[in-house]
């Protein structure tokens, strides 16, 4: 697992994953699950996509959105609720496709909202449209396990 402070790779055994005392071996920063998997969505860009998503070893939900999209605006609070509920297990990130067109184009994102679910840097699920919270939770349960 990469340290969010210095980027060093750390090994955390599965039985110690939730241990609040876990620290980075290099910089001694906390390696708590809520530090690695925050309770809120993290905005990313074309330049940070690889590091925040592809290099991240845990599950990640990427929301491709447009600030002018009505469905995206209605989905945002649902995703924030889910980010809080899945804190420590799934990392939530958002990518504004109007400002970051390279990744959206490369990933063939044709409409918004589009959600990609990654695990260990690999795309494992894709959801197009604003689904109900319970359905999104079902998709998240599949990658959080």
Annotate each predicted stretch with a short phrase.
Residues 1-90, 99-102, 106, 114, ...:
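Proteins that catalyze or organize thiol-disulfide redox chemistry
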Residues 94:
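Conserved residues in the N-terminal Rossmann fold of short-chain dehydrogenase/reductase
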């Amino acid at each position: 697992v990469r340290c969010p402070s210095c980027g060093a790779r750390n090994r955390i055994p599965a039985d110690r994953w939730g241990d609040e005392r876990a620290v980075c071996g290099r910089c001694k920063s906390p390696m708590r699950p809520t530090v690695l998997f925050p309770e809120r969505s993290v905005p990313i860009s074309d330049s940070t996509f690889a590091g925040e998503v592809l290099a991240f070893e845990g599950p990640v939900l990427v929301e491709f959105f447009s600030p002018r999209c009505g469905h995206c605006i209605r989905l945002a609070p649902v995703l924030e609720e889910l980010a809080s509920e899945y804190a420590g297990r799934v990392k939530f990130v958002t990518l504004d496709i109007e400002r970051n067109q390279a990744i959206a184009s490369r990933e063939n994102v044709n409409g918004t909202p589009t959600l990609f679910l990654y695990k260990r840097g690999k795309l494992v699920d894709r959801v197009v449209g604003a689904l109900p919270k319970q359905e999104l939770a079902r998709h998240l349960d599949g990658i959080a396990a």
